[in-house]
Amino acid sequence: MRLVRSAGWIVPVSLLSFSALSVLFHNTPAASAQTGTPPSSSISSSSGPVSWDFAAVGGGTVTNVGIQDICPPGMCDDHDLTLILPAPSVTFYQTMTAKLTITYTWTNTVPTDLDVFAISPSGADHGPGSPDDTSTGPGIEILTVTDPVDGVWHIRSVAALAPLPASAHAVVTLTTAARPTAPPPSPPAPGAPTFVNYAAPEDCTAPNTPPGCIQPALGSTTASTHGAGEPSIGVNWNTGKAFIEAGNHTLRVTFNDSVTPATAFWEDQRSLFARVSLDPILFTDDGHFGGTNRTFSSQLNGVTSELSFTDDDGNSWLPTQGSGQPAGVDHQSVGGGPYAVPAPSVSTYPHAIYYCSQDIVTAFCSRSDDGGLTFGPGLPIYIFTTVSGVNRPVAPGTCGGLHGHVRVSPDGTAYVPNEKCMDANGISRPGVAVSADNGLTWVVRTVPDAQSISPGSDPSIAAGANNTIYLGYVNVDGHAKIAVSQDRGLHWSKSKDAGTPFGTQNAEFAEVIAGDNNRAAFAYLGTPTAGDTQSADFLGIWHLYIAFTYNTGRTWTTVDATPSDPVQRGCIWNSGGSNPCRNLLDFNDITVDKFGRVLVGYADGCTGSCVNDVSQNATTGPATAQDALATIARQVGGRGLFAALDGTQFATRTGNIVGGGNLCYGDPASGISGGPDCNTH
């Protein structure tokens, strides 16, 4: 059982105190205990199964703390397993796939939870096995590693709970098979949404001038277009100008639709009041629900933010209070929309503007009634209790982990999605904090057929024109799921797997936007590669997929918006810090313009030589495989999110449907139909 950490709560699984653990780490030599029989072995695709016995372990230990060379006898036992592939893994996995399966069993007369971990030659940690639970009598965990690298692995036996020391037995198999080959994406069927991707240009250096490059803003030496992890995006519905914000820069993009394909002119319009960059957030109060097209730029700064706004597309900015108090220390969000009835008696701006942020235990939201200049008090949106000085979640009614971005529906209901919310049975599920009274009170509602993945990424929510809400999330199995509610989250439709047409086995960064009540778009990064996406050894190739519904979520049309250009090769890290696979940071963003055209702002982690070089990945580099280039995927064909504009090609009347897409409808329950490759990707 791992030590699970999230911003909402910490679940300890150790029988050791922290001080004892510190003594252990400082006084124990950096060596692995190897007292099992035998202490080492080798396995290949032709060797058949190998097996061994682990020595007895007990007493409990903390696992996965980042110190993989310490394995004290009696609490841990290692077995060195040399894995031999027919060819080096970098070349072998271009055409083949493999699975290393460890069946780990034990018997004890008292409740016992033993765990097995597999530590790769590069130090990547896989495990524990499944089921990760407590048993009396016989116990079992099965750990499967997909596409393991060659070299010496440490297979580790530890005890999360073992009042009586227990030995374990391991049987390991290695199977290989030809990697399924998918044909190139089919030409998009008529009506399939299609996209063109616009990457930010390089900084201008003499003698180069825009539009072939981007001129850094006054006072900046760079526009930081390659530092665009966790971007947010907005569009001014009056001028058509798009904004993508990441780091300390607000990039303005002007599209020229008089030519085909449209061209993009990039400018650095950063706010002079964005002095620091911790978490950057941009929000445009666009014309979707009658907004003024005011754009907000927020930079987290301690327990508030440096917030400013522009009413002239970034030519000038006005600083504001930043947030109400109290406020959280992480992962802030700015959003807005119509007021719920009854509206405040005094307001000087047509929409409520919300500032929400994650604190150590709960999360707070405050509301502005003057267009973001000042904010009222921050109010907690989750419920916790304190037991013996320790904050504990209350089920139901609380969420842990990091929340997503606040969204407001036409009827004024405010929604803050979260990946880990507890239902009445204490099960952690994706859910949403809901306020129907302009942020004064909140209630948490969960999706009953969803289950949280850890570590995960933010879910996303959006409301249609008649208040139907769409919640996109990554499920416990790693799949991209989306659920629909027409009563503010009291009841949900059965979640649909948007990645089915392309065989998506792992997804990250769910982002949702809606238009007409029955239309929505769901963007996510996905890969058909199974396995642990947090592992340094993960070799998945990630693309940007966007699913559309035109019938309130009954069926979805999924397209690959980056069919010939991966967004990432390798792992995508979700646990903070400076891991090399955290180049994309925590999320992407999505919006819609006044023509119903969907735009997705994302960081491209695989650029230049990485696009075609299969040996590159985010773990080992080079820099082209660890990039975060500001990029916009802009819809150029197919039906958008407003039925009134169907067939106009977003008012350009070009009829252009150039792009990559695969028209596929349905899910496993209702059946898949569409293009010839719908079931082969």
Describe each region flagged by the PLM:
Residues 36-97, 101, 107-109, 164-165, ...:
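C-terminal PAP-associated
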Residues 10-26:
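Bacterial N-terminal signal peptides
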Residues 117-171:
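Noncatalytic accessory or regulatory domains flanking protease catalytic cores in secreted, cell-surface
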Residues 1-7:
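N-terminal secretory signal peptides that target proteins for export/translocation
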Residues 30-33:
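Boundary at the C-terminal end of the N-terminal hydrophobic targeting segment
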Residues 19, 130-136, 562-566:
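Short linear Ser/Thr-Pro motifs
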Residues 112-115:
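Calcium-regulated, polybasic anionic-phospholipid
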